[in-house]
Curated annotation (Swiss-Prot):
Source organism superkingdom: Bacteria
CDD domains xrefs: NAD_bind_Glutamyl_tRNA_reduct
GO molecular function per UniProt: glutamyl-tRNA reductase activity; NADP binding
Active site: 50 (nucleophile)
SUPFAM superfamilies linked to this entry: Glutamyl tRNA-reductase catalytic, N-terminal domain (SSF69742), Glutamyl tRNA-reductase dimerization domain (SSF69075), NAD(P)-binding Rossmann-fold domains (SSF51735)
EC assignment: 1.2.1.70
Source organism: Proteus mirabilis (strain HI4320)
Free-text comment about domains: Possesses an unusual extended V-shaped dimeric structure with each monomer consisting of three distinct domains arranged along a curved 'spinal' alpha-helix. The N-terminal catalytic domain specifically recognizes the glutamate moiety of the substrate. The second domain is the NADPH-binding domain, and the third C-terminal domain is responsible for dimerization.
Protein name: Glutamyl-tRNA reductase
One Gene Ontology term from the biological process aspect of the record: protoporphyrinogen IX biosynthetic process from glutamate
Length: 420
């Protein structure tokens, strides 16, 4: 039995190719069933996200297995093999185990340490459970990988520092203000970045969120999700004085918030400090605003500096995480190798049980026919001893005859022979 991980990801293939080999949730059952029909496949899990498509498999035989499965992947998605040739990778046994643990821990992600991938791996595992495509080895491997991912996040700082613009903006706000629970925050725009910012802020239970957008309709959906008030861009001048923090990200070609607008807001606020974070390109907030007292203005470049520093911290945490993966993958492989002896142990025990039953049956019959019980027991013990030592004795003699000292010593050790 061997384990195999095979696939493509954001590092090896462009999005155009990743799209071609992705698996939709609607077809996952069919894909797993089809995969199990392939020669030597004992179990399989398909992980398909926007950044990767990977097959995790337990196989009866590893001979040319990755080539056969690459062919299956091409046939299933109706693409030519040459399209995958330079993009596909595969890992066997220990490397496959380490790879899954790294993936689940966010160590192989586009954004190092991102937590979403663990949920996606768990979903792939659940699909395989639902469609009965798991082997016992894969089930054990995935469960182990989940515990490794949890250990990585608990014992390292891999997820502690912001590495996205949205998260960095929220981190900056928390650094400047001790608590966000008493603050009003104005978000300008309603695109993807502002959506992420709004969700991060809601998690920190801010007092109030106001969303300003060109059209109220687009902003209303997000407002409903995070319990926010919606205004139009033209209402910003009137509402700006309420805001302790302003985070802006629109596609406007011209600034939306000018120096005069902020001066009026500060006057109404009696010069209480304001934090303005401009993550738009071109900028939404006039740069001259940074000259005003009690105003802290940060641009996307300032956030990038924070993000780069945090990336470096995550890289340091990733080194610790890699040590955890190395340790845990080694332990899993010890368990997996031990499973290779389970069948042999079971067969050996069954053989011994058959011998015991056979000898006991003969002894009982002799005693029932009037034979002396003590003589029967003596005879039985000698016969049992001879039967049990016959095969090991022949093996020892053969190893000695062949001059195979290594095998001879191994046999001696396994039989508990400690003296020459």
């Amino acid at each position: 039995m061997t384990l195999l991980a095979l696939g493509i990801n954001h590092k090896t293939a462009p999005v155009a190719l990743r799209e071609k080999v992705s698996f939709s949730p609607d077809t996952m059952g069919d894909a797993l069933n089809n995969l199990l029909q392939q020669p030597a496949v004992r179990g399989g899990v398909v992980l398909s996200t926007c950044n990767r498509t990977e097959l995790y498999l337990s196989l009866e035989d590893k001979e040319n297995s990755h080539e056969q499965l690459i062919s299956w992947l091409c046939q299933y998605h109706q693409i030519e093999p040459h399209e995958l040739k330079n993009s596909v990778y595969w890992h066997q046994d220990n490397q496959a185990v380490s790879h899954l643990m790294r993936v689940a821990s966010g160590l192989d992600s586009l954004v190092l340490g991102e937590p979403q991938i663990l949920g996606q791996v768990k979903k792939a595992f659940a699909d395989s459970q639902n469609y009965h495509s798991l082997s016992s080895e894969l089930e054990r491997l995935f469960q182990k990988s989940f515990s490794v991912a949890k250990r990585v996040r608990t014992e390292t700082q891999i997820g502690a520092n912001a590495v996205s613009v949205a998260f960095a903006a929220c981190t900056l706000a928390r650094q400047i203000f001790e608590s966000l629970s008493s603050l009003t925050i104005l978000l300008v725009g309603a695109g993807e970045t502002i959506e992420l910012v709004a969700r991060h802020l809601r998690e920190h239970q801010v007092k109030k969120i106001i969303i300003a957008n060109r059209t109220k309709e687009r902003a209303q959906r997000l407002a409903n999700e995070v319990d926010a008030e919606v205004i139009t861009l033209s209402d910003i001048d009137e509402s700006l004085s309420q805001a302790d923090i302003v985070i802006s990200s629109t596609a406007s070609p011209l600034p939306i918030i000018g120096k005069g607008m902020v001066e009026r807001a500060l006057k109404k606020r009696r010069n209480q400090p304001m934090l303005l974070v401009d993550i738009a390109v071109p900028r939404d907030i006039e740069q001259d605003i940074e000259k005003l007292s009690n105003v802290y203005l940060y641009s996307v470049d300032d956030l990038e500096a924070i993000i780069q520093h945090n990336r470096e911290q995550r890289q340091a945490a990733a080194i610790e995480a890699e040590h955890i993966v190395q340790q845990e993958s080694g332990q899993f492989m010890d368990w997996l190798r031990a499973q290779g002896a389970v069948g042999a142990i079971r067969e050996y025990r069954d053989s011994a049980e058959m011998l015991r039953a056979e000898m006991a049956e003969k002894a009982i019959a002799l005693i029932q026919n009037g034979a002396d019980a003590e003589k029967v027991i003596q005879q039985l013990s000698h016969q049992l001893m001879n039967r049990l030592i016959h095969t090991p004795t022949k093996s020892l003699q053969q190893a000695a005859s062949d001059g195979d000292i290594e095998r001879l010593n191994l046999l001696r050790e396994s039989l508990g022979i400690t003296h020459n």
